[in-house]
Amino acid sequence: MLRRNILLMSGIAATTSVSTLLAACGGGNNSITNRDIFELVRNDANLSVLGDAIISAGLVQTFQSNTSYTLFAPNNAAFVAVLAELGMTKDELFADKPLLNAVLTYHLLPGKVNFADLLLNTPLKTVQGATLKIDNIAGTLTITDGRARTSRIIQTNLDARNGVVHVVDKVLLPPV
């Protein structure tokens, strides 16, 4: 019995070591590109509020679909800032389904657009219907939203099986 437990524990340790090594090397089952956009967001601690917002808005199927999208994903700090800016709590924002849906779909472009392919100084139509514009300001790519607010793109080309995610430092707001 003791020998069997030792063998079992050795097998678990070996499996864990191989899994850890593959994850550290970026190898294995290419889990990043096998994830859909929603899974990618849900598995990133810095995007947890966005994941909760997607669930609250009832948009999980959109972010899991086979349709390709580009998501400008606001990080958690961006949500904290926009709640203060709007004078709302997270619960109030999440309860306002039309506003939440409009804000989230304003962060989506149809199709997969990698960082290098983003068009500068050109209005880009979002899934929500309004446009946003990407500019290069002093060497930093920024997005100007429908209320003339700017957001920096701080992380790029997080690949998902149904598109790509670029992390931004502000929640983008559509025009009023």
Give names to the regions the model predicted.
Residues 2-13, 18-176:
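Mature, structured domains of secreted/extracytosolic soluble proteins
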